[in-house]
Amino acid sequence: SQSINYLECHDNRTLYDFLKLNNEENHILDKISLGLAITILTMGTPFIHAGEELLRTKHGFDNSYNLSDDINHIDWYKIPNLTNTLKNLIVIKNKYPHFSYLKKEDINKYLRLEQTSEITSIRYLAKGFPDLQVVISQDYNEYTKYFAPGTKLIFDGNNIVDVTVEKYDFIKPGLYIFKK
């Protein structure tokens, strides 16, 4: 079977508009970044709605198909935006076969899910490649996780990095990738 993974589509409000109701701007960035990461790296076909990475707004209108360009336009120059985060996620998805398993048997064989009340952690295995651990932090509570010696942080929620870590303090929502 196949899946199309998405956070928003042309119907109803944009994710930015929905989150704007109850969140500060920096929290909106963190949450959309987390959502984009899950959408891109989850098995299946990612669908990114036009302007989602640019924090597109339809100014709270649900169905805007019959409204003007003032409502439906994409602000290509909006700062801040998540364009670089999206590019980095696509690089990671293409670099590591861990995120492209197609068969249920492979998913069952090569993925290990660990969940606590603070974070979700998924260990990805791939023959001939280093093990990856994806950690999903879902809130702003601080949580420290310890790692085996030699572990490297390769994605910090927004950027591709290469930092050796023995422990990491998660302080905001995000998807983080570690390599052993």
Regions found by a protein language model. Give the residues of each.
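Alpha-amylase-like alpha-glycosidases and glucanotransferases acting on alpha-linked glucans and related
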Residues: 1-26
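Carbohydrate-interacting/catalytic domains
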Residues: 26-29, 38-48, 52-180
